[in-house]
A protein has these predicted regions:
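Amphipathic alpha-helical scaffolding segments comprising HEAT/armadillo-like alpha-solenoid repeats
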Residues: 6-18, 39-53, 72-86, 107-121, ...
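Structural detector for internal amphipathic alpha-helices that build alpha-solenoid repeat scaffolds
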Residues: 1-8, 25-40, 50, 58-73, ...
Length: 154
């Protein structure tokens, strides 16, 4: 069935092959595409799980996000996203927060995610503070902007 499932005209097996590319941008694209395909790409779960060990942080984040969309949320994908909240690169922290926020208000590991996101409310980078605050708002199921956004004006 996977040969019939495609994203941008490319099949699941072809996107899985991209996860092994020597080019980290191609690996990230492969993870992104598999995440866009979602549950129909279940044959890619083990390959996405392997990509969680990629040497490039942004590939790990996109692989974790894809795994969370392809497989039921929780497990290793959430663990990787939470770990990447502590990355030295601001864009990786911001991206991890963004993806955690989109998992919804109930998933295994949400308590740890909420704790780490609250810690990021004081991050030195404004983009990280914004994404952490928005993720907190989504995960806590509040329609109003979270109070953490107030720290952005200081």
């Amino acid at each position: 069935m996977s040969a019939q499932v495609a994203y941008l005209g490319t099949s699941v097996p072809d996107w899985v092959r991209e996860l092994s590319s020597s080019d980290p941008l191609q690996r990230r694209l492969g993870a992104y595409a598999l995440g866009e395909i979602g549950p129909a790409a279940t044959e890619a779960v083990s390959d996405l799980a392997a990509a969680l060990q990629d040497s490039e942080a942004f590939v790990r984040v996109w692989a974790a996000a894809a795994l969370a969309r392809v497989a039921p949320p929780g497990g290793e994908s959430v663990t990787v996203l939470i770990a990447e909240l502590g990355d030295e690169l601001a864009f990786v922290r911001s991206l991890a927060a963004w993806h955690l926020g989109r998992l919804g208000p109930a998933f295994p590991g949400i308590e740890q995610a909420l704790l780490r996101l609250r810690q990021l409310a004081g991050d030195k980078d404004p983009s990280v503070r914004v994404e952490a605050a928005l993720a907190l708002g989504m995960l806590e199921g509040k329609g109003a902007p979270p109070p953490e956004l107030k720290s952005l004006s200081t």
